[in-house]
Swiss-Prot record:
Gene3D superfamilies: Glutaredoxin. It catalyses: a hydroperoxide + [thioredoxin]-dithiol = an alcohol + [thioredoxin]-disulfide + H2O. Its EC number is 1.11.1.24. Belongs to the peroxiredoxin family. BCP/PrxQ subfamily. GO terms for biological process: cell redox homeostasis; cellular response to oxidative stress. The gene is ygaF. Monomer. Pfam families: AhpC-TSA. It is an enzyme of class 1 (oxidoreductase). It comes from Bacillus subtilis (strain 168). Disulfide bonds join 45-50. This is Peroxiredoxin Bcp. The lineage of its organism: Bacteria, Bacillati, Bacillota, Bacilli, Bacillales.
Amino acid sequence: MTIEIGQKAPDLELKGDHGETVKLSDYKGKYIVLYFYPKDMTPGCTTEACDFRDSHESFAELDAVIIGVSPDSQEKHGKFKEKHNLPFLLLVDDEHKLAEAFDVWKLKKNFGKEYMGIERSTFLIDKEGRLIKEWRKVKVKDHVAEALQTLKDMSEK
């Protein structure tokens, strides 16, 4: 079953990039910008992560935390964060539990080869833990700016 707008976000336990156990409910009282990306250190994923990094303060001013999610290991996340000075949490979803709950673990095709992987997507979760906005099949260019503007518009209401 896939989460839909207005529903509570799944509260699964995952490992953070420092080995800590993390649940989305740990951030109740804040907006969560939850973004799923395919793989650390790849061009599109690096661009997206750096765009979120560069807008991190603007999101924080709106009482939002940014959380990235991929199947990569804690060690790979650590190297990725260090190399690109990422100031936000990266979650290890090596069993694809959170990706499946948000329906972003998909059959993909590249150069004629089929495989399972993350469909780049972002979800905005409100301060009570409910999904309020989703962006699926994200194109990296201008995505972070759009997500930030959406949050600004919502917080002005």
